[in-house]
């Protein structure tokens, strides 16, 4: 399902970002055409100050290599086209989370590099966006929590010491929530619309009805997955702040089932966080419970979610029906 969502969602996202990034875009270490002479001469990685996990060798190398090439006067462009190949995603939730946390550790190393004045401004923006990609989950949780606490205790801006400027405009919270949802789902909705309007693409997905049905299911899947990842990444950032990181090893790409025991061992903390959120609001503000469903449903269901999404019979059934075709 995630790969299906990436197929149409990333096409529209990449098309838009490639337009404004122009010749100073990012580079990913797959499906790339590289000027080897320039890459060897100008793409060498710096060694970061300090010890791992924040210092030492650069882990997320490709973005830094792109910025180094831009500094030397070369272009790095993203071509938002499909050429018949793509990178496979991890086959189960534990491996998916492991890869994301590995990237999180690598991207947060960019805090040492983003301020370099001799690098292209667009390249520095790319590094800043890569950092924010992983800080955004924690920021989202803080934003939602503060909003719910404010509502639960009936506080306005003038009663909260952290806001000395008084009460915010009445519609600001709603506008922020709408903006957040729009930024999250707009690329996928645009990609679905593009595929529906293109007869060849529509047929490659199994037809319009199959595309729309799978698109709705994938959106629901994404709504469960997003808060799971936000909690997992927030916990991991806290771990990084204590100097503990992950070993950078290759990810598993072969499909495998996740047992109840493994799912429980890996995700009990995320489930507990979701339960704390639900119990807290049930006690303090039961009227707000409906609003925390998007945040708490994924963490509460993470263990059966990790188990169910790796069942061989489910994968065979979806593939046999060409559901969520990629």
Model-derived segments and spans:
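Cytosolic/matrix-facing juxtamembrane and C-terminal tails of multi-pass cellular membrane proteins
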Residues: 307-326
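Basic/Trp-rich segment in TM-proximal cytosolic loops or flexible interdomain/linker regions
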Residues: 22, 89-289
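Generic preference for hydrophobic/aromatic residues in regular secondary structure cores
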Residues: 84-85, 248, 323
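Internal catalytic domains of large membrane-associated glycosyltransferases
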Residues: 1-118
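Alpha-helical membrane-embedded segments
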Residues: 182-185, 291-311
């Amino acid at each position: 399902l995630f790969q299906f969502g990436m197929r149409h969602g990333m096409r529209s996202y990449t098309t838009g970002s490639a337009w404004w990034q122009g010749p100073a875009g990012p580079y990913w270490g797959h499906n790339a055409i590289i000027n080897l002479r320039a890459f060897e001469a100008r793409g060498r990685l710096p060694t970061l100050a300090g010890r791992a996990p924040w210092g030492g060798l650069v882990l997320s190398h490709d973005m830094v290599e792109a910025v180094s090439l831009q500094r030397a006067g070369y272009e790095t462009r993203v071509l938002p086209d499909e050429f018949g190949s793509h990178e496979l995603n991890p086959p189960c939730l534990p491996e998916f989370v492991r890869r994301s946390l590995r990237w999180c550790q690598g991207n947060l190393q960019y805090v040492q590099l983003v301020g370099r004045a001799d690098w292209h401004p667009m390249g520095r923006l790319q590094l800043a966006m890569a950092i924010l990609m992983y800080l955004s989950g924690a920021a989202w949780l803080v934003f939602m929590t503060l909003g719910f606490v404010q509502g639960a205790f009936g506080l306005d801006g003038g009663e909260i010491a952290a806001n000395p400027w008084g009460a915010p405009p009445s519609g600001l919270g709603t506008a922020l929530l709408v903006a957040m949802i729009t930024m999250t789902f707009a690329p996928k909705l645009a990609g679905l619309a593009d595929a529906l309007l293109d007869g060849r693409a529509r047929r490659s997905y199994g037809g319009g009805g199959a595309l729309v049905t799978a698109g709705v299911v994938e959106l629901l899947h994404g709504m469960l997955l997003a808060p799971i990842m936000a909690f997992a990444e927030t916990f991991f950032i806290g771990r990084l702040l204590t100097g503990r990181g992950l070993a950078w090893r290759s990810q598993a790409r072969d499909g495998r089932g996740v047992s109840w025991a493994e799912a429980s061992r890996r995700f009990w903390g995320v489930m507990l966080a979701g339960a704390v959120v639900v119990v807290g609001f049930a006690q303090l503000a039961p009227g707000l419970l409906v609003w925390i469903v998007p945040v708490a449903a994924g963490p509460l269901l993470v263990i059966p979610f990790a188990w169910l999404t790796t069942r061989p019979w489910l994968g065979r059934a979806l593939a046999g029906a060409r559901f969520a075709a990629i």
